[in-house]
Structures are given as structure tokens and as C-alpha cells.
């Protein structure tokens, strides 16, 4: 799983991670079996909203959900899951970019500097093990906090 920070400002009112899933295996992977989790602190009590700003797979094929989490530099995760219409990733292929944007309902600032999955130095796609990829409920990439 590759990650890049589309917004490197750690102290503004939006979190903008982008993702690219690479299939290093020898057979196609059905995207509907995969989920991506990005871990962060929501820095306050306001609820968090999420949007897919753009995705090569088509934003309508990606669902966004949020969950509570207790771990190092995280109290919340955002999970991206894929519909069957998203298709599959061929052996040796990749999903293409998915651009996620999150903000709080009151538009207050985040402090991403203390977020487990944030790395503002990653401005181009790079492998990043602090964003976790699940397949059929099992971790296949990354380390959860």
C-alpha cells in the first residue's frame, strides 16, 4: 500500500491522504475483499466527515466509514472499502490513486503531527506501513497502532 500526504500542513482543518494499492502477487485481487485503514486523532469531540475527492476506480465505488480506536497516536480510524463494481487489481498491477479528504463537522483544526498514519514528508507515493490494508479481515500490509 502506498500513501502520500496531499496536504502537508499538520495544523489545518482538513486531512488529505491519498492511497494506491499495489498487487505484488501472481493473481488478481478482488477490490471488494480489501479495506484500507488510516489512523488519526480527531482532536476534539466534533464528528468527522469524509469525501472521496477523486479516485481512478470511481469515487462511487468506495465507501467511507469511521471507527473508534485506542492506540498509539490514534483514537479514530477511517476505513475505505470497495464495492464489487470497483473490480480487481491484476497481478503486478495497481489501483491508481484514491484521494480522501476529511474534516470535522465544526471545521476546527486537527493536529496531524500526533497522528499515527500521517507523514507530511511523503509528498509522492511511497510504501507506508502505518496505513493498514486488510483482505478478508486479515492484515496483509502495515501495522495497526
Curated annotation (Swiss-Prot):
InterPro entries membership: CBM2/CBM3_carb-bd_dom_sf, CBM3, CBM3_sf
Pfam families tied to this protein: CBM_3 (PF00942)
UniProt-listed PROSITE patterns: CBM3
Domain CBM3: 1-145
GO biological process entries: carbohydrate metabolic process
Molecular function terms, GO-annotated: cellulose binding
Listed name of the protein: Uncharacterized protein in celA 5'region
